């Protein structure tokens, strides 16, 4: 029988529930258990696909094409289970499905209410994510996860928020139905240090647990976040006023790398408490690979700096998976990768010289016209000065636009996203494609923004003799999230000018990778997909590994010139 661990948060948001949940999952997996994670988001958006990165951070794309919360990226990087559409759902999805059922008459004329209809729907979504299907049409509609031993369910938001109440009530009911040996509650809270008083304050934690108990939930474990280890005296005080056993009050202090958190939680007995509560007999945890990973992170042999030219630079969460993928590749090369954000809105031909100090340049994905000319400047500077360049999604498109303007003689080349009536639309809207499941998707300029992009895992053929072929072999399969592509009408003109189309889909002839020959540039690649979503700290990713290797070579060359 599948066991459930519910992870909630209190006092303030952004405490790291996702990292805590993923760390617990990693420890349980090291004990031989099959684990999955499910994220419940209380906002009314159907998914985060149309939300601003400044509001939400990165949108993580799963293999099956779901646009999900960035925490699912942490989940995939911490455990071996791959996330699916069923691993993340929102209030918007829940209410939408309830209202559709009401319109169909599924409720047989009953008054539709938050309790029981919305809370029952939440429970069904949770169970599907844990591999427990309901044998209804919703199983096919939303997908069902693989059966697991333990499902860790992270409830977004903060206890006390109005939006979270139906979710908390739903998991309270679910825990009652399943029994105390099949469910556990872990509550992440905040213990602030007041500098003027010179002490940690436990009152906010007492109040957030009181709020949970009013709802009918008694936490089994408290993860107490602070900027320092919490002394035993304060832990005893928290235990007394929250009715949580002392050994269940765990100190979680700030760490210089998230990969230290599994060891931190294990050494304080979190996994042992959960296994005892859920009556799970397992082998001892083995975190040796986490220890090796932390050692690699803390003892790099070399150091490089990457310039990331984007417009969401004020919030690093906008590029969370990308940042991690670069660091993973650095680990593979025993190198520390520093990432310096360059605001593309301020980048002009006159200021482009500031890019000369970097070991490589990267233009990430994005949407909209704002900052686009600065990204084109970054691509041009990298091409003209032999600096390793990686363009991802929009980054490939701006590299194509730049090459069309300055090498293919297509003055005014642009994307129809930014200039619908431009003279040379070298990037244009995709109107038809075939998904991995064989279904044909069609779109036009009047399609809704939400859920209408080319999403999820897609495959393409790789041209022999290219850098792309060295990295991927004959076929590349990566996750996508875009609605614009290189215009097929201009491909021959671009190739005649020297741009290499190194990966292309069989059916639609959509351009997936472009590059420059090694004889022209040491490492210049653009990809239409998002390889960062498949990178892990254990294996890295071959594209990023090749990119970082080129950056290290460029760094060595710069040092040699300076000597």
Curated annotation (Swiss-Prot):
Mg(2+) binds at residues 71, 154. Allosterically activated by GTP, when glutamine is the substrate; GTP has no effect on the reaction when ammonia is the substrate. The allosteric effector GTP functions by stabilizing the protein conformation that binds the tetrahedral intermediate(s) formed during glutamine hydrolysis. Inhibited by the product CTP, via allosteric rather than competitive inhibition. Keywords: ATP-binding, Glutamine amidotransferase, Ligase, Magnesium, Metal-binding, Nucleotide-binding, Pyrimidine biosynthesis. Its EC number is 6.3.4.2. The active site is at residues 393, 530, 532. InterPro entries: Class_I_gatase-like, CTP_synthase, CTP_synthase_N, GATASE, GATase1_CTP_Synthase, P-loop_NTPase. Pathway: Pyrimidine metabolism; CTP biosynthesis via de novo pathway; CTP from UDP: step 2/2. Residues 1-280 are annotated as: Amidoligase domain. ATP binds at residues 14-19, 71. UTP binds at residues 13, 201-206, 237. It holds the Pfam family CTP_synth_N. It is an enzyme of class 6 (ligase). One of its GO terms (biological process) is 'de novo' CTP biosynthetic process. GO terms for molecular function: ATP binding; CTP synthase activity; glutaminase activity; identical protein binding; metal ion binding. L-glutamine binds at residues 366, 394-397, 417, 483. Residues 305-557 form the Glutamine amidotransferase type-1 domain. HAMAP family: PyrG (MF_01227). Homotetramer. CTPSs have evolved a hybrid strategy for distinguishing between UTP and CTP. The overlapping regions of the product feedback inhibitory and substrate sites recognize a common feature in both compounds, the triphosphate moiety. To differentiate isosteric substrate and product pyrimidine rings, an additional pocket far from the expected kinase/ligase catalytic site, specifically recognizes the cytosine and ribose portions of the product inhibitor. This is CTP synthase.
């Amino acid at each position: 029988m599948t066991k459930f661990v519910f992870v909630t948060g209190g006092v303030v948001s952004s405490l790291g529930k996702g990292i805590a949940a993923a760390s617990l999952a990693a420890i349980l997996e090291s004990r031989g258990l099959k684990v999955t994670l499910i994220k419940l988001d209380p906002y009314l958006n159907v998914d985060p696909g149309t939300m601003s990165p400044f509001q939400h951070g990165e949108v993580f794309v799963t293999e099956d094409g779901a646009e999900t919360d960035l925490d699912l990226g942490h989940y995939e990087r911490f455990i071996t289970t791959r996330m699916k559409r069923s691993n993340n759902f929102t209030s918007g999805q829940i209410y939408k499905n309830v209202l559709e059922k009401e319109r169909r008459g599924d409720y047989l004329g009953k008054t539709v209410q938050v309790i029981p209809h919305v809370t029952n729907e939440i429970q069904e979504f949770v169970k599907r994510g844990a591999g427990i299907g309901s044998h209804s049409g919703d199983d096919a509609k939303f997908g069902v996860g693989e059966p697991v031993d333990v499902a860790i369910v992270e409830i977004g938001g903060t206890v006390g928020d109005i939006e979270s109440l139906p979710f908390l009530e739903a998991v309270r009911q679910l825990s009652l139905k399943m029994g105390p040996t099949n469910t556990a509650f872990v509550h992440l809270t905040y213990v602030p240090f007041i500098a003027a008083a010179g002490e940690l304050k436990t009152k906010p934690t007492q109040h957030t647990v009181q709020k949970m108990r009013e709802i009918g939930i008694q936490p089994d474990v408290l993860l107490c976040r602070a900027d320092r280890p919490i002394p035993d005296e304060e832990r005893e005080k928290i235990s007394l006023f929250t009715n949580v056993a002392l050994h269940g009050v765990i100190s979680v202090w700030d760490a210089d790398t998230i990969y230290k958190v599994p060891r931190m939680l294990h050494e304080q007995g979190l996994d042992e408490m959960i296994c005892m509560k859920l009556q799970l007999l397992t082998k001892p945890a083995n975190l040796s690979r986490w220890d090796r990973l932390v050692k690699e992170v803390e003892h790099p042999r070399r150091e490089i700096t990457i310039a990331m030219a984007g417009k969401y630079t004020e919030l690093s969460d906008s590029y969370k998976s990308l940042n991690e993928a670069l660091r993973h590749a650095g680990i593979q090369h025993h190198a520390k990768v520093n990432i310096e954000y360059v605001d593309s809105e301020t980048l002009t031909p006159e200021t482009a010289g500031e890019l000369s100090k970097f070991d490589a340049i990267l233009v990430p994905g994005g949407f909209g016209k704002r900052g686009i000319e600065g990204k084109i400047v970054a691509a041009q500077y990298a091409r003209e000065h032999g600096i390793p360049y990686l363009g991802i999604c929009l980054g490939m498109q701006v590299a194509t636009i730049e090459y069309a303007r300055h090498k293919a003689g297509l003055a005014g080349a642009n994307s129809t996203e930014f200039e619908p009536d431009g003279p040379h639309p070298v990037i244009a809207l995709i109107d038809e494609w075939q998904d991995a499941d064989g279904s044909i998707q069609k779109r036009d300029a009047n399609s809704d923004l939400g859920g209408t992009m080319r999403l999820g895992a897609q495959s393409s053929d790789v041209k022999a003799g290219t850098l792309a072929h060295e990295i991927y072999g004959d076929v590349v399969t990566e996750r996508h999230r875009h609605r614009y592509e290189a215009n097929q009408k201009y491909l021959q003109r671009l190739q005649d000018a020297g741009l290499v189309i190194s990966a292309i889909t069989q059916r639609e002839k959509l351009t997936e990778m472009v590059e420059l020959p090694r004889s022209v540039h040491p490492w210049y690649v653009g990809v239409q997909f998002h390889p960062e979503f498949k990178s892990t700290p254990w294996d890295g990713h071959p594209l990023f590994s090749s990119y970082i290797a080129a950056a290290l070579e460029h760094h060595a060359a710069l040092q040699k010139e300076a000597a």
